[in-house]
Amino acid sequence: MNEKQLRQQLDRCLDHVQEHVDMLSARAISKLSGDAVANHEWLSELSGRYPTRSAEELQQFRELKDGYVKKLDTLETEVKYLEDLGQELAEFQNELSVKLQRIRRNSYVQEN
């Protein structure tokens, strides 16, 4: 085979590959377009069945949520403080108990 025939065969092969790629691309685009239309119809159907909230209402919910989050943070801080305070009081009570036992021992020793 000479160079000219090889180039012609190569060009034909490239043409067939390009046709195949074009056909697969067209199928993919067609399927994507069909899916997009079906999804749009489904969205319209769902929007009719389940109404969405207005932007103002959603903003009110966000503000309410933010307020509750702030209150929750404040409560968590207070709970942490009270837990620490309770722990400190328990330690203080233990120290008092130890001191009271020492005082009792000392007074018992002094009496005897």
Curated annotation (Swiss-Prot):
The keyword Coiled coil applies. Keywords: Coiled coil, Endosome, Transport. InterPro entries: BLI1. It comes from the Eukaryota. Residues 55-105 form a coiled coil. GO terms for cellular component: endosome. It is found in: Endosome. Pfam families: BLI1 (PF17324). Component of the biogenesis of lysosome-related organelles complex-1 (BLOC-1) involved in endosomal cargo sorting. Belongs to the BLI1 family. This is Biogenesis of lysosome-related organelles complex 1 subunit BLI1. It comes from Eremothecium gossypii (strain ATCC 10895 / CBS 109.51 / FGSC 9923 / NRRL Y-1056).
